[in-house]
Amino acid sequence: MTVREPRATDEERVTAPVGEAGVEREELPLDVRVEFWLETFPWFPAFSAGFGAFLLGYVGLFATVVAAPLSLPEGDLPIRVGFLFYNAHNVVVTGVTTALPDSVPMTMDYLPLVGDPLLYRFLPAVVLTVASALFTFVRVPVRRSTTAAVATGAAMGTGYVLIALAGTFVFTLNVDNVLYQPSRAGTMLYVLGYGLLCGVCGSLSGQVAISVVHRT
């Protein structure tokens, strides 16, 4: 006769530390799992990781532009690199003449001016994915948890898009009575999409790394 060991109750599983071996949270009822992650997930550090990923991506792009000079327009290099960074997220930079506020906005795209546009498009995605993987490995050390990956992607994506929206007020340039700045609607759409997708994928990659480490 086979004797089964007693299984932990839902309450015992929920109170167990994140990542503890033998805790099968995916078997818990959905409402219990949601409550668990809302109460225990490190939301603020995840938001901060999203902030940091955006800043790191911008600094990395700025260093790349300085090391390998691109044919960007002269002057206001930090602002123009910021425009390029937003362009890499598929966000257009719009310009409205201050003399005619109701005129049709113009657009600015620096990607055609660089040698390899695809490389610059990949840069923010790679930085954000790696940041999410590292965050998962250090702060949310769980294995095979879709809930953890979604929570990480949502939190980091929110932090990422919030600082990107703030950046639309910082990265502005007035040229010949035309005020240029990244599109805020485009920032909400594309940057949030980048944050969610790369945040989830990075978290799943971090979980794979955790599984590999535990097997060795």
Language-model regions: role of each:
Residues V34-W37, G115-T158, T216:
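Cytoplasmic juxtamembrane regions at transmembrane-helix boundaries
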Residues G50-F122, L173-Y190:
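Long, glycine/tryptophan/cysteine-rich extracytoplasmic
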Residues A49-V65, L128-L134, I163-F169, C198-G202:
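Hydrophobic core segments of alpha-helical transmembrane domains in multi-pass membrane transport
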Residues V3-E5, R139-T216:
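Alpha-helical transmembrane segments of multi-pass integral membrane proteins
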Residues A8-V14, F62, N90, A164, ...:
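Generic alpha-helical secondary structure signal
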Residues D10, A68, L72, T94-G95, ...:
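An almost-null, non-specific background feature
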Residues M1-L55, S145-T147, V208-T216:
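Haloarchaeal acidic low-complexity proteome signature biased toward cell-envelope/secretome components but also
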